[in-house]
Every structure is written in structure tokens, then in C-alpha cells.
Amino acid sequence: MPKSESHGVTINYDIEGQGPPLVLVHGFSGNRNSWRGYGFVDPLKTEYQLILIDARGHGESSKPHDPDAYDYRLLVDDVIAVIDDLNLTTVSYLGYSMGGTIGFGLGKYYPQRVQSLIVGGCSPFNRTDPTEPSPMLDLYEQAADQGVELIIDTFKIWFGSITPEYEARLRNADVRAAAAQLRWMQDHSPDYGNDLSAMTMPFLIYIGEADEPAEAQECATRLPNATFVMLPGLNHVQAAGASELLVPHIKTFLAETL
């Protein structure tokens, strides 16, 4: 299984399909196989070379327990390390939630390396107060001592239900690494709002209607070249797996931008 080295950590990835390269990075608590479970890989690999990355702290990549190891600039560099190892000059990119925030970082720091960006379930703005309580951070820091069942039980309350595949991923996660990443995000979450006007590559922005979409909509209006897709009635978790709705939009967007 191919791996890359980046800032002292190992980044794991898979390659499927043939065609123009499309990098995929999952959301927090996911891994490269999330895209398979959600039904994105099979319809996309017939037209694109899919590069499915385990972000640091996830899957089979390294899982540091130091919050500073999860600086988003490092996560952006991890993607570049992979595409450098593959001798790719430019790629298209698909990221959801955490993976979407990494996408905005690519647009800021490495605009010459991305032909187009597909970003879902996230905002480029940091309008949160780091002194305000973070229920997610509190949950993971408690679970680091009490066990992962606390996370699973709480998520079932928060989201109504979770899929067996998602529950299995939670059980296999390194809770202390996840808590470290959430701690960095709480204290230092990036704000790319002032950088949007300089990101001139094509963007496809998508979000669930029940996932507080106002900031994603604002983002799409401030980007010079963006298409916006709202997924009716879907929350954050549901939108992550909405491949039947999203794949047609993704294929149309990539056909127009490659």
C-alpha cells in the first residue's frame, strides 16, 4: 500500500481508476474508505484516477497525540507530499468537512497545483470564539479516558442514528489523536475568508440544507468562479454520503473544468 512522508508523519493512500487525477480527502473521524462506503468510488473511478488519502490522525496514516501536529497547514502539505510522490503537477480535489477545509488551504497555499476544487460541508470562515465551549471537543476529551462508547452513544442522540459503517469507524479510531486534532481546531481553526477573492480556480461548493448553509452560500458568492449546490433536507452526516445526488454534479463540474 503506497505511503508518503510529510513533516515526520506517514500518509497512507490508495489509487483506483484511470484518467485525470482526482484527490479525495474525507471528513473528521473518517478515512479513505469512507468514499467507498458512501458510494463515490465506483461511479468516479471509471473516468478518473482517484487518489484516496487517509488524513493524518485517521485510517492507516500516523496518529500523533500532540495538538500542534494537526495544524491545517501541515494537513495541506500532506496532500502535496502525496501528489509530489506521484509526480503529478496538478490535480482536481474533492474534500468533505475537514477535507473541505484542507481544500481551501490548497487553494490558498498551492493554487498552481489544483485545477479545480470540490468542497462540501464546511466553511472557509472562522467566526467562532475559542473561549466558547465545544461540545465535540469536550466529548472526545472525556472519551479519551472513558472509552469510545461515550462517543457512539452521544452521536446517536445528536444525529438520531448512525450507520453501522460509521460506528465501526468510530470504534477503530484513535480517540486521543482525535481529541488532539479537535483541540487544535478549537484553538487555531483557520480563516480563509480574506483569501477567497484570490482563489480563481473553479470551485464546486455543496452543503446540506439542514447543515447551517449560510456561510457556504456566502463563500460561493465571494469566490470568483464558484458553483453552489444545496442538498435539500440533508444534515451534515447525511450530506457526506449523498453520492447519488452529488456524483452527477461532480461529473458535470469536472467535465467543464478539466
For each feature predicted by the language model, list its residue ranges.
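Conserved HGGG/HGGXW glycine-rich cap/lid loop of the alpha/beta-hydrolase fold
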Residues: 9-62
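Active-site loop/oxyanion-hole signature of alpha/beta-hydrolase fold enzymes
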Residues: 42-45, 51-92
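Flexible "cap/lid" loop of the alpha/beta hydrolase fold
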Residues: 104-109, 115-145
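Short beta-strand/loop motif that positions the catalytic acidic residue
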Residues: 199, 205-207
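Conserved alpha/beta-hydrolase "acid-adjacent" motif
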Residues: 210-218
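Catalytic active-site module of serine/aspartate enzymes centered on a nucleophile-bearing elbow/loop
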Residues: 226, 232-258
